[in-house]
Amino acid sequence: MEFRRILQKRSKGFSLIEMIAAMVLVSILVPGISLIVHGTMMNIAFTNMAVFANMEADYAQRNFIKHINGVKSFSVTDGDLTVDKLTFTSYLEDAEYQYEIDDSRQIKYSINAPPAGILLQNVVKDTTFDAVNYVSKFTYKDRNNNNLSVPVASYTGTNVAFNSGAKSIAVPSGNSFADFVAGNIITISGSTSNNGTFTIASLTNDNTIVVSESITTEGAGDAITVSTEVHGVELTFFLLRGESFYKYTTFATIDKNQLDI
């Protein structure tokens, strides 16, 4: 008779020491893994916010550039060209566009008349955080890309005199040229001998402009207008996404001015 021996394989469990060692190892690794996972998820969230903010900003900037490229003229009405309002007429059927950065944290624009459509939301209009000032605004530029202190600075009077030796344009009193700054391109009209465009080299005071180009001596008498002209607009805006500020700046000028420069 043959006998077969049946071998049984018995599993052996963890010893107490091994179990304690495993528990200690897990307690060390789990917090570190949690921090890694948490950090990864936060990075993904911040990246997504930045991507979506860039997409929204790109859409707004492309619209803004397209509209400014088609400008026929900027409004000369008081209050229509400010840091938070921009009004202009387009070559497209002479439509009037108006952009506004309003107090409801939106950038809106309308064509010909209200209501205005929303271009961007959650825009920081003017706030200070950690001693840093965040301001969304329109900045107006002349032909030399210099900032205009006032979008359309202008003075008209019969007391404007020209001096060829000093290359100066002067009025006797007041603050007639207070809104003009060095570097601005000015347009003179109504003059007998000095109509045209000139570059402001300096301002002796609020009553005297010195230009870079030659001028002809001419006494007061004619009704002469000295004015600046907007050739481009810079739009700066801050988007608030989560707890982060995202800054965007874009500059646009009308197509005709780009060809003239």
Task: Please place each PLM-identified region on the residue numbering.
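Short, glycine/small-hydrophobic-rich surface segments
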Residues: F46, F52-M55, I68-E93
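Small/polar beta-strand repeat architecture
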Residues: V152-A182, T187-E229
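Aliphatic-rich helix starts adjacent to a transmembrane/signal segment
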Residues: F3-N69
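A generic beta-sheet turn/junction motif
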Residues: S90-L92, T204, R241
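Type IV pilin-like appendage domain
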Residues: D80-S154
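Short, exposed beta-strand/loop patches in secreted or surface proteins that constitute
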Residues: K72-L81, Q98-E100, T127-F129, A153-S164, ...
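Short, mixed charged/polar active-site loops
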Residues: N63, D94-Q98, P115-Q121, N195, ...
